[in-house]
Amino acid sequence: NGEDGIIEQITKELNINNGTFCEFGASNGITSSNTFNLIKNKNWSGLAIEADKNRYNLCVENYKPYPNVQIKNGMVLFNNAEYNLDKWLEKSNMEKDFDILSIDIDCDDYYVWENMTQFNPKIVIFEVNSYRDPVFDELPRKPSTEYNIDLLRQQKPGRVAQGCSF
């Protein structure tokens, strides 16, 4: 869907050459990955987190040629201090101002992002529900498996939505 090209252009404009990332909802590390192109072709390092054990095992296998990538099995939760994003990043010794955060957990994306307070990635990638308008002022009243992302709501101070691909 063009994500690799969008990401490459943004990293070029920000002058990020050999960066760091965290991708959770990493799946098998290749399919639907927002960071694999950077790992494979730009020698990026970082953290891939996948909750599903089978997909995690595939990710471990697929990332064997890339020792700069840590692969973790577990869930990233917004309402559990032991498994929130800050804790995962802290345990993995991630830099406070790492380059890319890719969120693709098919639920609670907004709440996980909202509760990340200790780290400040330069670029944040969200999954959107392509069946809905990506810019709407609506959010489920409670966390759910409905992955609706409101681009305007995702903007934290100093952040601007740059694009959306379907």
Where are the regions a protein language model picked out?
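Distinct, well-ordered alpha-helical segments
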Residues: 83-89, 112-117
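Helix N-cap/coil-helix junction residues
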Residues: 16, 94-95
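Conserved acidic-Pro-Pro-aromatic motif
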Residues: 37, 43-45, 96-103, 107-166
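SAM cofactor-binding core of SAM-dependent methyltransferases
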Residues: 1-88, 100-103
